[in-house]
Amino acid sequence: MKRILLTNDDGFDSSGLLALKDALKDIAHVMVVAPASEKSACGHGLTLTRPLSFVQLDDDFYKLEDGTPSDCVYLALNTLYKASCKPDLVISGINLGSNMGEDITYSGTAAGAMEGCIQGVPSIAISQLMPDKNCSKHFDFSLAKECIYKITQLIFAKGFPLGERKFLNINIPHIKPKECKGYKITQMGYRIYADNAHLHRNPRGQEYYWLGLHPLEWEERNDMPHSYGSDFKATHEHYVSITPIKLDMTSYEDSSSLCEWIQL
């Protein structure tokens, strides 16, 4: 039977993670290793300055005390799995909210998939657009579950479609399954960020800040080398967005001009 490792950045008790586990339980042996608390926007951080420990909650279900999604994947692949029986797939999600455009550089969900592909395992990050996390407990993940089930079955049948150090980033629109127009292969769009630092004062008059969540605003890119639209546009038009992501962030098109510029 195929083996899948699941993680996320919303924490081990997230409704999105539990929905993901439920979607895949009949087609693979599923192990869950997730952070003990929410780690949203933690990026690809590894914990190097304090010890980490697993807490087993059920058969093949663990939380990692004070760990990040990258910690979860790294430790699971190097301790819970034997070298001869690594999982066939790492899936990070289902995130409560989108991970599109440059947001993936902040995303713990994307980082879980990044760590999987760094460790040599085909990996997927999947996120569900929603108005806010307050609605997540009663959210209907039917479309996301249907999508990840189909894509996982396709991977098992045909193999992973990307090469080394690349992963799939999937975003599910906030619509009912019957409203979905299908799937689109996309490119990362441009997220528009606004000043959303909120100044407050405690009872002693000391200032502190809360970083708010930016409204999901974006602009379509005009520098795309291919005809694919953006992840933002696809979900806005009621398509499931599937973006191939590579970890090599070298700007190759700038190499020649940089060589000329550096001649001092």
From Swiss-Prot:
The keyword Kinase does not apply. Binds 1 divalent metal cation per subunit. Keywords: Cytoplasm, Hydrolase, Metal-binding, Nucleotide-binding. It is found in: Cytoplasm. Gene3D superfamilies: Survival protein SurE-like phosphatase/nucleotidase. GO terms for molecular function: 3'-nucleotidase activity; 5'-nucleotidase activity; exopolyphosphatase activity; metal ion binding; nucleotide binding. Nucleotidase that shows phosphatase activity on nucleoside 5'-monophosphates. Belongs to the SurE nucleotidase family. This is 5'-nucleotidase SurE. It comes from Helicobacter hepaticus (strain ATCC 51449 / 3B1). The gene is surE.
